[in-house]
UniProtKB/Swiss-Prot annotation:
It comes from the Bacteria. It holds the Pfam family HTH_8. NCBIfam families: PRK00430.1. Activates ribosomal RNA transcription. Plays a direct role in upstream activation of rRNA promoters. GO terms for molecular function: DNA-binding transcription factor activity; sequence-specific DNA binding. This is DNA-binding protein Fis. SUPFAM superfamilies: Homeodomain-like. Homodimer. The gene is fis. InterPro entries: Fis_DNA-bd, Homeodomain-like_sf, HTH_Fis, Trans_regulatory_Fis. The keyword Transcription regulation applies. Belongs to the transcriptional regulatory Fis family. The lineage of its organism: Bacteria, Pseudomonadati, Pseudomonadota, Gammaproteobacteria, Enterobacterales. Keywords: Activator, DNA-binding, Transcription, Transcription regulation.
Length: 98
């Protein structure tokens, strides 16, 4: 589950361990760990378009959740994300979310 702390601009990821303890860590830590895992699996192979890969992994759920939060209101969603409405529409189309 993703949450944003009210008093900061840090997105956090909440996890529950086997003792039902909830811990939170910044989303960036989860991204960093995912990249470490990805690089470990490469075994020295070259990779291209890593930026696009990571961006797509974050951008699609971001768009999905913002559109749910705004109940499909693209104007509100674009304002919330700080992007132009036309840019939002282009991104929604890219991921088949239009």
């Amino acid at each position: 589950m993703f949450e944003q702390r009210v008093n900061s601009d840090v997105l956090t990821v909440s996890t529950v361990n086997s003792q039902d303890q909830v811990t939170q860590k910044p989303l960036r830590d989860s991204v960093k760990q995912a990249l470490k895992n990805y690089f470990a699996q490469l075994n020295g192979q070259d990779v291209s378009d890593l930026y696009e890969l990571v961006l797509a992994e974050v951008e699609q759920p971001l768009l999905d959740m913002v559109m749910q939060y705004t109940r499909g209101n693209q104007t509100r969603a674009a304002l919330m994300m700080g992007i132009n409405r036309g840019t939002l529409r282009k991104k929604l189309k890219k991921y088949g979310m239009n």
